[in-house]
Amino acid sequence: MTVKITQSDIEDDLNQLHIGVQMTGISEEDGTCTATATRKGKSVTATQQAIYNVNRTECGGLRFSLDDLSSGTWKVAVAYESPKYTGLSKTISVKVP
């Protein structure tokens, strides 16, 4: 099972950072994704219930309010946990304006 961040967009009109994730190699809907953004010792989290999608599992709606994220580069990683599986994505960098 692999956890992969597939989307990271600043949505200015909605004042949020949107993170999308896919878990390949599994197809289930009883897991949870937790995204953690960190910068200068501050951590902010966003959580979503996983969604079953034929040949994979997804979390496409992980969102952080930009009010909670100061301007600069944030490190973001996503953990997946279910009764059967656990996994962690690679960390990505996201620039917040």
Question: What are these model-derived regions, one by one?
Answer:
Residues 54-63:
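Aromatic sugar-binding surface patches on proteins
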Residues 17-25:
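Short edge beta-strand/loop segments characteristic of extracellular beta-sandwich folds
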